[in-house]
From Swiss-Prot:
Protein's organism: Homo sapiens
Gene: PRDX6
Positions of post-translational Phosphothreonine modification: T44, T177
Active site: C47 (cysteine sulfenic acid (-soh) intermediate), D140 (for phospholipase activity)
GO MF, one annotated term: peroxidase activity
UniProt key word Oxidoreductase: yes
Protein name from the UniProt record: Peroxiredoxin-6
Domain Thioredoxin: 5-169
Region of interest (Required and sufficient for targeting to lysosomes and lamellar bodies), residue spans: 31-40
Length: 224
């Protein structure tokens, strides 16, 4: 599949028609973090539950200066009509308004550019549809995270929020987040930081787990 982005790549500054009008991507992002996520088709069951959950979590993303924007190969008109179903799924007033725009990529230009097409899933004309892709961009417009799911498996937007919190924390502090980490849990001190420097950087304390190897690389500190 042609196109695609690698970690560290700058997001293409594309223009697109959306449910809130025409946008230029870099202008849309501004100085914020951004999540661009694609789905296979409007008016389908898994996609409805996904965008419903994204809408529910939109205030949590906004609190962290994260903008959401969705994409599929459907038209703006379909996006707006489908938005009523999404709001109804969330037991809210069935309006056309969602807390994020949806891109109209019916010609598949962006899907090809960004490597979002799923060759195994096709529309009624035999053309590939967009996979369940998630791109997280930092304020520098660079790709910080990419996730790719098949059409049959819905994404966990609570996990995407957790990952964004980790990305923002580790962008500001010299720490890493361990397996199953949640906001507020202890974090790990980077192995490149010498012991004496770590004590100064993390006044809440550094706790080292003793290991059979004798190496002192498992170092924890309360979340800064």
């Amino acid at each position: 599949m042609p196109g695609g982005l690698l970690l560290g790549d700058v997001a293409p500054n594309f223009e697109a028609n959306t449910t809130v009008g025409r946008i230029r991507f870099h202008d849309f992002l501004g100085d914020s973090w951004g999540i661009l996520f694609s789905h296979p088709r409007d008016f389908t069951p898994v996609c409805t539950t996904e965008l419903g959950r994204a809408a529910k979590l939109a205030p949590e993303f906004a609190k962290r200066n994260v903008k959401l924007i969705a994409l599929s190969i459907d038209s703006v008109e379909d996006h707006l009509a489908w938005s009523k179903d999404i709001n109804a799924y969330n037991c809210e007033e069935p309006t056309e308004k969602l807390p994020f725009p949806i891109i109209d990529d019916r010609n598949r230009e962006l899907a090809i550019l960004l490597g979002m097409l799923d060759p195994a899933e096709k529309d009624e004309k035999g053309m590939p549809v967009t996979a369940r892709v998630v791109f997280v961009f930092g304020p520098d417009k660079k790709l910080k995270l990419s996730i790719l799911y098949p059409a049959t498996t819905g994404r966990n937007f609570d996990e995407i929020l957790r990952v964004v919190i980790s990305l923002q924390l580790t962008a500001e502090k010299r720490v890493a987040t361990p397996v199953d980490w949640k906001d507020g849990d202890s974090v790990m001190v980077l192995p490149t930081i010498p012991e004496e420097e770590a004590k100064k950087l993390f006044p809440k304390g550094v706790f080292t787990k003793e290991l059979p190897s004798g190496k002192k690389y498992l170092r924890y500190t309360p979340q800064p």
